[in-house]
């Protein structure tokens, strides 16, 4: 069953769209897929941390 791969791909697409929507000025969120390893670079994670 390759459903797990489809779920991962959909999750990456949603993450990419969300990162682009949260930072429309500087879309520096980059996602690479090498085999089964997922590499996420950029300041995408910094934009998700909001001070309470």
From Swiss-Prot:
Location in or out of the cell: Host endoplasmic reticulum membrane
Sorted UniProt keywords: Host endoplasmic reticulum, Host membrane, Membrane, Transmembrane, Transmembrane helix, Transport, Viral movement protein
Segments crossing the lipid bilayer: 4-21
InterPro entries for the chain: TGBp3 (IPR003411)
Cytoplasmic topological intervals: 22-52
Cellular component GO terms held in the UniProt record: host cell endoplasmic reticulum membrane; membrane
Similarity comment text for this entry: Belongs to the Tymovirales TGBp3 protein family.
Other comment: TGBp1, TGBp2 and TGBp3 seem to act together for cell-to-cell propagation. TGBp1 is the main movement protein that physically cross the plasmodesma with the viral genome. TGBp2 and TGBp3 would facilitate TGBp1 function.
Name assigned to this protein: Movement protein TGBp3
Originating species: Foxtail mosaic virus
